[in-house]
């Protein structure tokens, strides 16, 4: 069951956290990358467009209801978690920018549940192209495609800023191109000026 975001605001993105944030209470939001239930403790890798942070859920911190929610998390659930940033008590994960810290969860809200995706949302996936294209909205969550989209956005923004600073005007002109109804028919629009014509 999806919960409300009322009164909740993200304080930072996952990969923006570092050892400098140890001791701070933060709210992070994103997709569940992995969830590992070890009995009395649940580890979750939370992913947003910036990267991944490890979350730890213990019943003593989240209460019985919060721990029960954490125990049912699956891949691609969307969650909002509030907790305290701490140094990792176990081994440091050298593969993550945030590998030396974790967030000890105090509160969790499940914003959206998800069925198991048809392929793993991860970099260098060996998934066939036709399946990736069928589920393009999931494929665009992969880190390598996210980086491409972010880079494209930054280049477009910098280009616009540069041209604006040089005194250029951005004018949106009509784009003349061939109609592509893709199997459907074009809509016929009656003419107001010439009755009976389209």
What kind of feature is each model-predicted range?
Residues 3-198:
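Class II aminoacyl-tRNA synthetase-like tRNA-binding/catalytic domains
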């Amino acid at each position: 069951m999806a919960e409300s975001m009322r009164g909740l605001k993200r304080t930072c993105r996952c990969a923006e956290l570092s050892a400098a944030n140890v001791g701070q209470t933060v709210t992070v939001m994103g997709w569940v990358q992995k969830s590992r239930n070890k009995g009395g403790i649940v580890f979750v890798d939370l992913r947003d467009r910036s990267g991944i942070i490890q979350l730890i859920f213990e019943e003593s911190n989240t209460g019985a209801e919060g721990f029960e929610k954490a125990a049912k998390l699956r891949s691609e659930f969307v969650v909002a978690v509030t907790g305290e940033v701490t140094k990792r008590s176990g081994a440091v994960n050298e593969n993550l920018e945030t590998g030396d810290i974790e967030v000890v969860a105090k509160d969790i809200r499940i914003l959206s549940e998800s069925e198991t995706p048809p392929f793993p949302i991860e970099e260098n996936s060996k998934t066939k192209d036709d399946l990736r294209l069928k589920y393009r909205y999931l494929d665009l969550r992969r880190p390598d495609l996210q980086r491409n989209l972010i880079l494209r956005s930054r280049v477009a923004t910098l280009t616009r800023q540069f041209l604006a600073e040089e005194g250029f005007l951005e004018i949106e002109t009509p784009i003349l191109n061939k109609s592509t109804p893709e199997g459907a028919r074009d809509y016929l629009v009656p003419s107001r000026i010439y009755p009976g014509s389209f």
